[in-house]
């Protein structure tokens, strides 16, 4: 059996303090119906909570005096965990989607790529438009700029340009974000 070195504290408790773990000598007590019972000694409040068959849970430790409520600890922790999971689930992380184009793109291909860009923007994602130059196409940088300006014009109602077109090696990049 492993023993804790002399003088070291026990493992810190996760979650709210309850019953004998409440360190404050006096607490403001709220019963199971939400009624304020006033400020009383922690021991007295714990006894009242046990009479009702509940625990005394510290819900606001930073208040003066701390606020404690008559609750079922297991149920309280479960509800808090459920609330945290729901908040994490509903939180939308904004992703950067990438669409690759060519300087000499045909109209139908362009329309297909534009539909995808619009779909990404409506979903709330940023879109990185990459225009790749091959071989001698590098000599015709203005063609790439025209395609980028066309994308910019076609998305101006639903998006704003976050990063204007710029060359990076053999490719031209632009980032558009939803408005």
Curated annotation (Swiss-Prot):
GO terms for molecular function: ribosome binding; translation initiation factor activity. One of its GO terms (cellular component) is cytosol. GO terms for biological process: ribosome disassembly. Keywords: Cytoplasm, Initiation factor, Protein biosynthesis. Its main location: cytoplasm. Monomer. It comes from the Bacteria. The keyword Ligase does not apply. Belongs to the IF-3 family. IF-3 binds to the 30S ribosomal subunit and shifts the equilibrium between 70S ribosomes and their 50S and 30S subunits in favor of the free subunits, thus enhancing the availability of 30S subunits on which protein synthesis initiation begins. HAMAP family: IF_3. It comes from Zymomonas mobilis subsp. mobilis (strain ATCC 31821 / ZM4 / CP4). It is found in: Cytoplasm. Gene3D superfamilies: Translation initiation factor 3 (IF-3), C-terminal domain, Translation initiation factor 3 (IF-3), N-terminal domain. Pfam families: IF3_C, IF3_N. PANTHER family: TRANSLATION INITIATION FACTOR IF-3 (PTHR10938), TRANSLATION INITIATION FACTOR IF-3, MITOCHONDRIAL (PTHR10938:SF0). This is Translation initiation factor IF-3.
